Amino acid sequence: MKKEIYNVEGIEIEVEHIDKNDADRERRLIAYQFKTIREQAGMNRKDFSDWLGIPYRTMQEWELGRRQAPDYVLRLIAYKVKMEKERGNL
């Protein structure tokens, strides 16, 4: 299957192709990107939510695609993960 590569604040995310006509495409794409960023940080959901100061339930719903994280929040979190990795804090 065709894969698409997205770059979110310097973190490359490879995603299986999601049909452009899929009504839930954007929500599913952001959910997958959010999960990938968390995995890049090397944390489980609980640790990641504590580290970011985001309620666990909110983060879980973003990651499962039940709610859509705002795009700017995804970019800010990706930036924080990238910077903390560069500083050696992750």
Regions found by a protein language model. Give the residues of each.
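N-terminal flexible/basic segments that precede or flank functional cores
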Residues: M1-R28, A78, M83-L90
